[in-house]
Structure formats: structure tokens, C-alpha cells
Amino acid sequence: MEAPALEQRQSLHDSSERQQRFTSLILPNGVGCSSREEPQGSGGLLVPHNDNDIDNDLASTRTASPTTTDFSSSSSDDNSTTLETSVNYSHSSNTNTNTSCPPSPITSSSLKPAYPLPPPSTRLTTILPTDLKTPDHLIRDPRLIRLTGSHPFNVEPPLTALFEHGFLTPQNLHYVRNHGPIPSSVATPPATINKEEDDSLLNWEFTVEGLVEHPLKISVRELMDASKWDNVTYPVTLVCAGNRRKEQNVLRKSKGFSWGAGGLSTALWTGVGLSEILARAKPLTKKGGGARYVCFEGADQLPNGTYGTSVKLAWAMDPNKGIMVAHKMNGENLHPDHGRPVRVVVPGQIGGRSVKWLKRIVVTKGPSENWYHVFDNRVLPTTVGPEESGEKTEEMERVWRDERYAIYDLNVNSVICEPGHGEVVSLRGDEGAGTYRLRGYAYAGGGRRVTRLEVTLDQGKSWRLAGIEYPEDRYREAQDGEELFGGRLDVSWRESCFCWCFWDLEIPLSELRKAKDVCIRAMDESLALQPKEMYWSVLGMMNNPWFRVVIHHEGDTLRFEHPTQPMLTSDGWMDRVKKEGGNLANGFWGEKVPGAEENVVKEEPVKEISMVDEKVTRLITLEELRQHDGEEEPWFVVNGQVYNGTPFLEGHPGGAASITGAAGQDVTDEFLAIHSENAKAMMPTYHIGTLTPSAPAALKSSSTSDPALSDPSRPIFLQSKTWNSAILTFKESVSPDTKIFHFALSHPAQSIGLPVGQHLMMRLPDPAKPTESIIRAYTPISDGTLERGTLRVLVKIYYASPTEDIKGGQMTQALDALALGKAVEFKGPVGKFVYQGRGVCSVNGRERKVKRFVMVCGGSGVTPIYQVAEAVAVDDQDGTECLVLDGNRVEGDILMKSELDELVERAKPMGRCRVKYTLSRPGAEWEGLRGRLDKTMLEREVGEGDLRGETMVLLCGPEGMQNMVREVLKGMGWKDEDVLVF
């Protein structure tokens, strides 16, 4: 049977029917103001309304009284957040001085504007409790959906709220993509800025440099000066490249976090066109200059350096592309989350190109070498999986750097917003004879217009056209010279489309009740069409298959189910189908295909590693266990099973103390928390029996049998077999992702009791599982033998990095979130190395004498290295030579640099200590070594193995670095006993 032809329907954009359905709510000049005669409105919207709702909507917007909405669960909650809705715009120089009403943001002699103005900004007065635990401490809207936990701040608005606000999104509901903390210099919430801080932000400068004839340095104050720069205003829809990624993650986990369909927002941006700025700088495109790209760099300090990216110079110089350096958003100064005080806005391209907190614009011959440009915002071939993408091979490096895979222009995309997820429509009586109006949004990239939106109720056998409304076109009708928010409205001459559009289609309920689902697809003016099938890629970006909403027929109602919901919730038809065994990649959304062989997808069971020897049947009493609680033959218990650690005293990476300290104890929590799967697989070798049924409880009750060990007045804090508490008193930030945590010991005269070169164990309750603990080993930066009353621990905080599929450090994030005044438990010392001073050290209890230490470290691995180097440097009688090789990616990653440099100065008279820093991604001004700690560098700086055994290599850093260094040193003739890994 021939499929019905596409329903031919006049575009409602120009029809009278459309004008009845869509109402433009225009911002009022204010209650009682006579200078303009617009109706009182709440702004923002060319929003589709039901015909019978128009009068109610207009009536409801005629009030200018502030409203307060309490989003707390109880009115008595001290942590509740109050939101005040009010009109608060920045104005042009002819601002109305009548303070009884808001002045108009529009400057012209024309009548009232026919284009949308922003909704009233929402004033939030309280920092949310979750943000008090992060480095940002910013006031944020509690309605925003957090996609990566509390930090970093990556959020999207609820789809319903986003759509209901219409064409323009309030600043407080605009989606946010932050890779790390907000730069501290701009993190003060705008509502609390004092004059001094405001001036400092107006004095914020960014540079234009590189391959230009006239380098520039421009302050925000200068940028806003109409006598110096042509400020313009126009609307732009920003879209995260990960919008709709959750759908890809359900099919197959990508390396990115789960955006829903709300990863986009639209605002009126005010600033100066990048083409004008570059025209003054004059890029050197000829005479051997070769300028082809424009790189942007922000002020945020991240694990991989500052955030930066690039676009092609030809685009940046094209006024029609509309790339802007913006300082206002919806008439307001930028919020810190949106780039305060100045940012780049790149219309039609993914949001990742619009760099926030702008500090540098650099004209170059090639694309940006910034880590975030190379290893983010790419659609790699679908054959590249998560494991392969992380391989450190030349081939994989080449794939990542292939500019063909970089994402610039957005692709065409569309979403069904109404019906919403979980919405129920009644079919009872007269209601069932009516219609339902499907509504949603669509967008395209590169300035291209969405030219059609098609809807199918039969899974693509037939299609019908929806009407499309383009609110952006209303700005093209503005009169020449009209200003908005201090910038010339710069839209009328453009052919490009920078914004989303709205579509709608009336469907008889009688047809919906026969359908299994509703699918939509959009096409842009280049005839690019949304595909039916998903193109999965390892970063999960640019997902744009047909948007499908399932219809559930439940008696006399219809219930609608969207594909997914943002975050980690398993809500939506995709998760449901997957759990039912459906194959989401079968081309039919996981449904069973008539005539096709059923292919049930089963989840792989989690493989548990056995830690017992099944042949061992011996029962061990508590008395027997206690006979082995010393150093001679240490036994310990894990999960009720008894293990003999004696054979592994020599080989344990943490030294014999790690085992003898556990002797006679149940160390289940500690063992499972810190040991790898490989370590667990080794355990059957040391398994000797099972505790008798009554022994575990008795062992637990006797764990604190010696009161002297926990006596707070004892002179030494650390105990090898007992956990003792210290109070967190202060967190000292030393870099964006590193802090020194200060703890108060039991009394001011108490020493830590940690020999040089040893570590301690730290234990915290797991916030996600209160009945479980997190345990990790750390090396304090305190002097473990001399310092009294306090304990200082330097910790690099591994924040969640969704782009790289990293959940973040369990311990470090929990420690960072811990409130001051809370207790943390410690135990120790542990470790196989002790430096006794003046060249004497011991390894696993065996003493040896050295004349030279070569210490290789990276990142927070510097802490045990610093301990040893300090012990050498502060003792004028210690003639041991020290060479420290500290390798990092960027200069901001170097920890304790000033302390290490001070040690060098202190030991300078005898020239005993040298420190060399090397960076794999150095900045232009870096004067130290460049490159990785590789074979070439180790051969040059360390040399061949010392056959006399008078030199030791001490090594601490990331596992990959440690393995590489050990392998290289082995090839250079270094013996295993001369290379020690902390």
C-alpha cells in the first residue's frame, strides 16, 4: 500500500492562525510610566499558547510586583533558597531617571519593539548548601539539574522550564558547562559586588597577539566605551556539543556525562564583533605571515592547563558569522558561571568554542594546541572505543589531533517538548474527540535555517509537516540605529540564523490513540536531515537521531515516555527497553522485529575475584590468631578469612610495616579499600583458614583492648594498630585542584610520630555509603618527628572529569567536602623506606649508606620526595647529594615549587641539592626543561646505574610514569634494589 503523501500545510509563520496562537510578550517600561505604552509583560517569549490561554497569559503578565518562590522542602528550613523575580537591566546612556519604574532598555525613536525581550531576572539570595562545599561558593538556581554532582558545575534547565520561558532564557536558568572551578578573581556573586571589585573587573584585560601587525591589550571598560568600539546586541542560541548525550550513554557508555535534551539556551548578547577587533590588530595573512587560525584562552586553571580552543581566521573576520567578545547577557553583566566579566560567543558552533573568562586571543598558523581543543569536542570514528581512545600510542595521538574530527558547526537537531515525559492525556468523553498540539524546538548550525520539521505517527512510513515559528526574525524588523542594552541591534542585514526555532502541529487524539509513538526529524537549508539511527562516538557528542516519544495506552488515557532523562536516573523508554533485553542498535529502537531472529541483550555479570583457596578447610580460633600478632609471623583477617603475610614481608610495595601493622587484626575495610583486583587475586596463595564462628565478634570487641593506645595524652599521635582521630581545622588552597589540609592533634605537644620517608593511612566515612569507609595512604608535608600539635597533608583533589569518563577521586572529593571541625582517622606509620639522616637509610629494615639520591616525581608524588630532600637540606652535616626531577604537564601543576626552591637555596653553599622541572605542555614563557620525563632526559640527567651501590633512585608519581621510569632505568643498568618506589 502506498504511503500517504506529506501533508501539505501552509507555514504558520505568516498565517493569521499562527499569529493568534503565538503571543509576543514584550517587556514593560514599568507600572505607571508614561514614556512608552507597551502592555505590562514578563518578557522573553515568542511562545506558542493554546488559543484560549492567550488572554489569561497576557493578564497574568501585567503585574510588575516581585514574586517569591520557595524551592525548599519546608518553610522552616534554614537552608531554603529564596528567589525574587524582578526586572533588572543594564541601560543605555539615556536611562529614564524615574526610579519608581524600570527604565526601558531600548534606545530609539520607534514605537514599541516587535521582538522578544528577556524574561525578568530571578534574584537568588542564598548559596545552596551543596555549593558551600565546592571551591565556587556561588549563588545558583536550585532548579538547574546537576549532571556531574556538586562540582564542577555542569547543569541544564528542566526541559519544561526551558521551553516555557520561550525564546530567551533567563541568565539563572541558562545551561552551564564548567571544566573546573570558577577563576577566583571573578567568583564573587554579582549581587554582592562592591565598588572596588566592580572596578577591578572593568579593568580586566585581554590581549590580541600572535601573527598580528598591531598587538592589542583591551580592558572591559574600554570594550564598553561606545566612542572606542561599536557595541552590538543580538540573540544567539548556545548549544553544548553533548546535548542529548544520555541517549548515546544508554546505548553504549561514552566518555562524557549524561546531558538530556536541555543542553541549550538562548540569550541577547552585547559586546564587540571579533571581526572589528581583528581588523584593528591586522592579522598577518600575507608576506610570509601565514595566519589562519584564531585561538582563545580563558583564565580558568584546570588539571590540563587553562581552557582554550580555536576557530578559523576566515570565520573570525567574517561579520556575517557574528563571533563576538561579549560583556553582557540579557542586558546584565555576565554571571561568573557565564564568563564574567568577558567571554567569546561563537554563533552556530558548539558551545565549547565560546571561551569564558577571556584572557588571550592569539592569531596563529595552525589550530590550537590546547589540551581541551585536542582531546575534547571531537567526533572520532565510531570504531574507536573508550579503551582504545585512552591508549598512549602514536596512532591514537594522530587520531586525536586530526582536525577533520574536530566539531565546529552544530548539526541539525530537534526535540519534542510537549507532550512532556510522563505527561498523561485523558481520552474520556468529549476530551477524546479533541486534538493535541505537539510542540518543541529545533536548531541548526553554521548560520543555517531550519527549513522543515516533520512528524510521523507510524515510525517513518508517512510524514506530515509542522508549522515553524522563527522568533529571531522579529529582530530583523527593528529600525536602523535601534539600540538594545547599550549595543546597536545588529540583525536586520544578516542572512544567517543564530537561534533555535519553535514548531507545532495539531494532531487529533483519535490518531494518537492508534499510534505506538511519535517521531520527529528536522532539515536545514543545506538539506541536512536528522538521521533515524544514532552515530555513536567515544565522546558522545552531536547526537541527533530522530527524537522519539513512546505512547503508552493505559485504559482511557495516554501516557508519554521520552527516550531518557538527564543525569544517572534510569527513566525513559531507552533504559526500560535495555533492561527488558531489547537491542537498541537493531534499527527499531529495541523493539522485536517481525520475522527477525530475536536478539536478547544481556548485561554482563560482575566477575567477583575469589580471595580464598577452596582446598583450605582449617578453622582458626581467636587465641591462635593472637599468637601471630607480632612481626615474626603476622596473620591477619579479611572477610572472616585468615591470611599469613610472612611470605610477602619482603615483596609488599608498602613495606613489611604494612603487614606487621595488620597482624592479629580484622583489616577487611582497609584491605578492600586500598587494594587492586590484582592484589585480591594473589590472596589465595596466603590463605590459611577461616575464623571460628564466634571469633569475628570477639575480635571486633577486643579491637580497643589497650587503653594506652588511644589515650589522648600520649606523646605520639600515630599508632600502627589503632585508628586515632584528628580534627580538620583549615583548608589552604595552593592551586585550583590542590589544598593543604590542616589537622589538630590530641594536644599541642603531641608529635606525629612519622619517620622521614614513611606514610600514614587516612580513613573517612564514605558519603555515598555511610556504613563503609574510604581509606588511602598519604605522606604529610609536616615534619613527622619535630612538628608538634598539628598535621598538614597536601592533597591533589581529583574532581570528576566527565569528558574523560572519570568519576573523580573518591577520597579526595570526600575530604574536600568535609566541614571544618570534623574528625578524620589516621593510622601508621607504613612504608618500607626510612631516611635516618646523613646518608643512612633503611629498606625493609635493612640499613644501607648512600652518597646520592636521584628523586623522580610528578604531581602530588612530590610529598615523600620533599620529605627526604628537606631532611638532607636542613642538616648542614649531611653531605648527601640530591637531584630532584619533577615532571608535570603545565606550570600550574607543579606542587611545592617554592618549598623545593627554598631547599636548593639553603643547601647552596655546598651545592648538595638541585631541582629540575620539566613540562610536557609548557607555556611560551617557561624557562625550564621541556618534554616528558623520557629515556632521553633520564640518560642526560641521571646517567648509567651506579655499580658501587652508592646512589638510590626514589620514585613517586602516576603509575604510568613510575612504570616507564623503572623500565628505562633498568635498560640503563640500574639494579632493582637501587630503585625504590614509594
Swiss-Prot record:
Residues 617-692 form the Cytochrome b5 heme-binding domain. InterPro entries: Cbr1-like_FAD-bd_dom (IPR008333), Cyt_B5-like_heme/steroid-bd (IPR001199), Cyt_B5-like_heme/steroid_sf (IPR036400), Cyt_B5_heme-BS (IPR018506), FAD-bd_FR_type (IPR017927), FNR_nucleotide-bd (IPR039261), Ig_E-set (IPR014756), MoCF_OxRdtse_dimer (IPR005066). Coiled coil: none annotated. The keyword NADP applies. Transmembrane segments: none annotated. FAD binds at residues 776-779, 794-798, 810-812, 860, 863. Heme binds at residues 652, 675. NADP(+) binds at residues 952-961. PROSITE patterns: CYTOCHROME_B5_1 (PS00191), CYTOCHROME_B5_2 (PS50255), FAD_FR (PS51384), MOLYBDOPTERIN_EUK (PS00559). One of its GO terms (molecular function) is molybdopterin cofactor binding. Its EC number is 1.7.1.3. Residues 721-836 form the FAD-binding FR-type domain. Residues 10-20 have a biased composition (Basic and acidic residues). It holds the Pfam family Oxidored_molyb. Pathway: Nitrogen metabolism; nitrate reduction (assimilation). Its cofactor is FAD; heme; Mo-molybdopterin. Residues 63-110 have a biased composition (Low complexity). CDD domains: cyt_b5_reduct_like, eukary_NR_Moco. Binds 1 FAD per subunit. Binds 1 heme group per subunit. The heme group is called cytochrome b-557. Residues 1-128 are annotated as: Disordered. Belongs to the nitrate reductase family. Nitrate reductase is a key enzyme involved in the first step of nitrate assimilation in plants, fungi and bacteria. This is Nitrate reductase [NADPH]. It comes from Neurospora crassa (strain ATCC 24698 / 74-OR23-1A / CBS 708.71 / DSM 1257 / FGSC 987). The gene is nit-3.
